[in-house]
């Protein structure tokens, strides 16, 4: 009998500390509210316009090393020089790129806890030291604790998901700026949900503050999760360095054309965001009146809802065809579910399901 071949010696030892990414409950449901996507698809007429232009492109040729036309369009859209912008295959690609550029064995990254799980995964893969700073009990950022830990631990990178996933809370513009001005560390501000926020973006600081990098995604407000488009923004000298590990040719011509067409029709995004915010606030008001159901005020396109038994409630919702995200395993989020805002009918069904739970709590 042959001895089983062990592959362990072939692998980076850091993989022992990393789990494969999974979406609990899968990605298919009658009412899908678990991945913070926009409930509004790109309209058919705009899809046809995009595909019509893409068909005329040569498919046998590589795209540009970087999608320069789309980068210039986005730079003009946000009001910064084109050399301060880089486009990626989703913002996660630039997250990988920036971590590769700035972290490694013996280097330190500060991450508020809880926050987006990919930050920790990448830091572990790169064998960097993680400095965790707990959020406050109301799931708000502890700004003073962040600055103190950054100084005492001499961290190399500070990562701020702002607004924060999974808590749905934000740090003020002034607070983010205060952190950036108080440290020599790179301050990476992940603004995946900024279009839904009451707070100002940090984009207008990138040429003034030499250590600030802003991440943006087109997967949420712009409804392009299936196309995979993200951006990083930083001052030109910093951008030139942190983009060195980036994979060339990572953005397709389809992504470039799509981005430019959506920006040219941005009123569609504005209308969708307005509708989502209206639904978010209405859903929050409904849920907070229910006994045994405690929603947190949100600055994103999702609500965090605390219940007595998150696991049981997740299953009951799933059995009703409603898929949400169980985030009860995160620090400070015991009993919590994450529900992104859907279409009006989907939100009505979700509220009805929570209302049934509330009636049972009353007994």
Curated annotation (Swiss-Prot):
NCBIfam families: hisC. Belongs to the class-II pyridoxal-phosphate-dependent aminotransferase family. Histidinol-phosphate aminotransferase subfamily. It comes from the Bacteria. This is Histidinol-phosphate aminotransferase. The gene is hisC. HAMAP family: HisC_aminotrans_2. Homodimer. The keyword Amino-acid biosynthesis applies. Coiled coil: none annotated. Keywords: Amino-acid biosynthesis, Aminotransferase, Histidine biosynthesis, Pyridoxal phosphate, Transferase. PANTHER family: HISTIDINOL-PHOSPHATE AMINOTRANSFERASE (PTHR42885:SF2), HISTIDINOL-PHOSPHATE AMINOTRANSFERASE-RELATED (PTHR42885). Pfam families: Aminotran_1_2 (PF00155). The modification N6-(pyridoxal phosphate)lysine is found at residue 220. CDD domains: AAT_like. Pathway: Amino-acid biosynthesis; L-histidine biosynthesis; L-histidine from 5-phospho-alpha-D-ribose 1-diphosphate: step 7/9. It catalyses: L-histidinol phosphate + 2-oxoglutarate = 3-(imidazol-4-yl)-2-oxopropyl phosphate + L-glutamate. GO terms for molecular function: histidinol-phosphate transaminase activity; pyridoxal phosphate binding. The keyword Transferase applies. Its cofactor is pyridoxal 5'-phosphate. GO terms for biological process: L-histidine biosynthetic process. Its EC number is 2.6.1.9.
């Amino acid at each position: 009998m042959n001895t089983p071949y062990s592959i362990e010696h072939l692998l980076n030892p850091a993989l022992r500390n990393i789990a494969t990414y999974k979406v609990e409950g899968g990605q298919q449901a009658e009412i899908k509210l678990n991945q913070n996507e926009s409930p509004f698809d790109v309209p058919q007429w705009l899809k046809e316009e995009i595909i019509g232009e893409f068909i005329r492109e040569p498919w046998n040729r590589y795209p540009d090393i970087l999608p320069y036309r789309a980068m210039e369009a986005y730079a003009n859209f946000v009001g910064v020089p084109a050399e301060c912008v880089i486009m990626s295959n989703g913002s996660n690609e630039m997250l990988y790129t920036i971590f590769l550029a700035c972290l490694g064995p013996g280097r330190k990254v500060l991450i508020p806890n809880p926050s987006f799980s990919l930050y920790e995964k990448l830091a572990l893969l790169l064998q960097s030291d993680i400095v965790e700073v707990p959020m406050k009990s109301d799931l708000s950022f502890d700004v003073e604790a962040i600055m103190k830990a950054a100084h005492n631990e001499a961290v190399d990178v500070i990562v701020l998901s702002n607004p924060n996933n999974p808590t749905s809370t934000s740090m003020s513009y002034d607070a983010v700026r205060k952190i950036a001005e108080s440290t020599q560390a790179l301050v990476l501000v992940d603004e995946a949900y900024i279009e839904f926020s009451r707070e100002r973006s940090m984009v207008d600081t990138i040429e003034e503050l030499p250590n600030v990098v802003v991440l943006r995604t087109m997967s949420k407000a712009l409804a392009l999760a299936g196309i995979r488009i993200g951006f990083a923004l930083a001052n030109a000298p910093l951008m030139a360095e942190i983009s060195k590990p980036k994979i060339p040719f990572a953005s397709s011509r389809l992504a470039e054309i799509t981005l430019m067409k959506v920006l040219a029709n941005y009123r569609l995004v504005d209308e969708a965001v307005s509708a989502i915010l209206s639904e978010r606030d209405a859903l929050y008001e409904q849920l907070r009146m229910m006994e045994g159901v405690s929603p947190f005020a949100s600055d994103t396109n999702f609500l965090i809802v605390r219940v007595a038994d998150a696991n049981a409630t997740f299953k009951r919702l799933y059995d009703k065809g409603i898929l949400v995200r169980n985030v009860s395993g995160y620090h400070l989020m015991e009993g919590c579910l994450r529900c992104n805002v859907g279409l009006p009918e989907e939100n009505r069904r979700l509220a009805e399901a929570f209302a049934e739970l509330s009636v049972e709590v009353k007994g």
